[in-house]
Structure formats: structure tokens, C-alpha cells
Amino acid sequence: MVSGRFYLSCLLLGSLGSMCILFTIYWMQYWRGGFAWNGSIYMFNWHPVLMVAGMVVFYGGASLVYRLPQSWVGPKLPWKLLHAALHLMAFVLTVVGLVAVFTFHNHGRTANLYSLHSWLGITTVFLFACQWFLGFAVFLLPWASMWLRSLLKPIHVFFGAAILSLSIASVISGINEKLFFSLKNTTRPYHSLPSEAVFANSTGMLVVAFGLLVLYILLASSWKRPEPGILTDRQPLLHDGE
């Protein structure tokens, strides 16, 4: 039986995820001038919002689908589809976030992919894309044998947690980079901790807290989905009745 601590953790996780997105929106709206889709700096402001929403919050939530007790009984297929759909939604938000930053850079003739933040971020997105397509092909389509799925499942689980960790690192480095670029004049330098810096740093801490809670729920052995019985060697997952 799953204890009330699990549901309390889920409630806390939902609150933290909502705060991560809302804090990022407020930062971009209040201190950075709001949003647009015209190649200006206001178009860039979509980038942090969409990356936090996609690569952290939606991705983290999608990773926990199989921790829900409701997914432990009855057909497994609906939960597989939900898991894949939430990750796909996270990926779409991420791609739109990348379009926003690349369009802004190209419009202002700023170099792309030169900073450590950008290298880390684009690597994370590449791994996410590989993870999603591999998971879809192996764990959802009916062609893969049980042997192949058993071989790849630990790798899939490892990269799921690794990608979330890399996403958090990308967000934190991105917040820092944005503050260094924006708060560099003599009236409000970053090192003097103006209100924007305090708020943005707090947003980063919320992202870290969200990520750590996701990892805690993922790693808690008592909250993992019980292993099903032995399946036939080539039972297609699109037709399973687990």
C-alpha cells in the first residue's frame, strides 16, 4: 500500500512545479518587459519559460506516471500512452523554446551555441530526443522482444533521471547567464543582489527543489510499480493487458 506520504509528496511536487513556471513567467514579465514573437528581446523571454515548463516540470511529471498506484492495476497501455504523450508535450515546448532563442540570436546577429549553458542545454535536448524515440520504438511498438526490452529498460531508466538532472543544470546555468548579461551596469550589478537577482535565484532554487523531489520519488523503492508476472517472449505492448 502506498502511504499518505506519497500523495503528500505529489501535492508538494505539483505546487513546486506550478511555482517554477509562474515564477519564471513573472520574472520575464515584470523585470524583462514581457513577451512577443518578433525576433526582439521579448521573444527571447519565451525561452526560459518554455524550457522550465518543458524540460523540467512536464518532463519530471511524465517520469512519475508509473509511480501512481492507479497504474499498477489493469491494462498498462493507457499509462504507457500517457507517459509518452506527456514527454512528447515536454519535447514540443522545448523545441518552441529553442526556436525562440535561436530566432532572437539570428535576428540580432548574435552567435549561437558558444556558451557552456548552450552546450549543456543542446546536449540535454539531443539526449531527450533519443530517449523518446528509443522508448517509443522499443517499449510501445510491438516489434521488440522481451529480451531487448529487459536489456534496454535499465538504460532507459538511467537516462530518464540523467536527462532531468542535466535539465536542472541547464536551467541553473541559464538563470546565472541571464543575470550576468542583464545586471552588469553600475546601478544594479549582480553582486549587489538587486531584487531581480534575489527573485531569479529563488526561482532557480525552486527548480532544484522540484528536481530533487522528482528524483526522490523515482528512487523510493516502496513507491515503485510492482514487477508484473513473466510475459511471453514477444507479447506486443500495444496489445498487452497487464
UniProtKB/Swiss-Prot annotation:
GO terms for molecular function: metal ion binding; oxidoreductase activity; transmembrane ascorbate ferrireductase activity. Keywords: Electron transport, Endosome, Glycoprotein, Heme, Iron, Lysosome, Membrane, Metal-binding, Oxidoreductase, Translocase, Transmembrane, Transmembrane helix, Transport. Heme b 1 binds at residues 47, 112-115, 117, 177. Signal peptide: none annotated. InterPro entries: CYB561/CYBRD1-like, Cyt_b561/ferric_Rdtase_TM. The chain crosses the membrane at residues 8-28, 46-66, 84-104, 120-140, 155-175, 203-223. This is Lysosomal membrane ascorbate-dependent ferrireductase CYB561A3. It comes from Homo sapiens. The gene is CYB561A3.
